[in-house]
Amino acid sequence: MTQAPWSLARKTAIVTGGSRGIGRAIAIHLTCKGLSKLAITYISNLAAAESTLDECRKNGLGMGIAIKADLLDPNIGHGLVQQALAGLETPTIDILVNNAAYLDPSEAASVEELTLPVFQKVMQANAFAPISIISATMPHLPVSGGRVINISSAAAKLANPGPVMTYGASKAALDSFTRSLAAEFATDKAATFNTVCVGPTVTDGFHVVGKLYPEGFMEELAKAFTAAQRVGMPQDIAFIVGFLAGEEARWVNGACMSANGGFREVLPALS
């Protein structure tokens, strides 16, 4: 029987930052589509990661593991991928979702106060780390049909205020790398490389950024500047990732898909 194009049966995935928020929603949704094996990463909360895997198992996940991984580890790519391959007892990674990101409000500063160490930390975590993971995954992609999906941000398309400026630049760098990877490796690897450009979404990161502004600012911003007049939910993003992960998205490559409910500030940047 031919497998339905939306099905992820018999496929294996890595989802970074899968213990909570968008990453958790992505992990759960992929298993709703039949994903067989899954590795998720966490930074400190193993219990949250195991909770995600428990939900995934309810959806029929055959094998799932949680891997502690730090985006600031210069060897994150090799270490993570080797642990995933061994733990899932597989030679192949069909789907890679780079969702984990870094933004520390205690270090956020205006451009006049920006220091090289802070700049390097944000760029390493949000640009180098996902590229390192992709590089380590490439030899283990399937002969055809591999999927690499990077979670980006509407901040990559905007002129951002000082505290978010470096974060936005790091995500713009990730977008650029993704387009280049699609151009460079789509033929050789028969894989797709795409980003999902996420607007205001209710996650821990959303609340972290919210601390940089007056109380309620982020919620009111989303209502005022989003056509949907609400803040996004993690599942909204997971649905788009689920599409990109499947055969249905085989003709989408090098794209940055907007997932922002019609965020008006971003719309001119996409034209």
Swiss-Prot record:
SUPFAM superfamilies recorded: NAD(P)-binding Rossmann-fold domains (SSF51735)
Q: Which UniProt keywords apply?
A: NADP, Oxidoreductase
The active site is formed by 152-153, 167, 171
Q: Name one GO biological process term.
A: secondary metabolite biosynthetic process
Q: Which domain of life is it from?
A: Eukaryota
Pfam families linked: adh_short_C2
Task: Give the catalysed reaction(s), semicolon-separated.
Answer: a primary alcohol + NAD(+) = an aldehyde + NADH + H(+); a secondary alcohol + NAD(+) = a ketone + NADH + H(+)
User: Any S-S bridges, and between which cysteines?
Assistant: none
Instruction: Tell me the residue numbers annotated for binding NADP(+).
Output: 22, 70, 99, 167, 171, 203
Record GO terms (molecular function): alcohol dehydrogenase (NAD+) activity
Please state the pathway this protein functions in, per its UniProt record: Secondary metabolite biosynthesis; Alkaloid biosynthesis; Mycotoxin biosynthesis
Q: What is its EC number?
A: 1.1.1.1
Cross-referenced InterPro entries: NAD(P)-bd_dom_sf (IPR036291), Sc_DH/Rdtase_CS (IPR020904), SDR_fam (IPR002347)
What is the similarity comment for this entry? Belongs to the short-chain dehydrogenases/reductases (SDR) family.
Function summary: Short chain dehydrogenase; part of the gene cluster that mediates the biosynthesis of the aspoquinolone mycotoxins. The role of asqE within the aspoquinolone pathway has still to be determined. The first step of the pathway is catalyzed by the nonribosomal peptide synthetase asqK that condenses anthranilic acid and O-methyl-L-tyrosine to produce 4'-methoxycyclopeptin. 4'-methoxycyclopeptin is then converted to 4'-methoxydehydrocyclopeptin by the ketoglutarate-dependent dioxygenase asqJ. AsqJ also converts its first product 4'-methoxydehydrocyclopeptin to 4'-methoxycyclopenin.
The name on file for this protein is: Short chain dehydrogenase asqE
Organism encoding this protein: Emericella nidulans (strain FGSC A4 / ATCC 38163 / CBS 112.46 / NRRL 194 / M139)
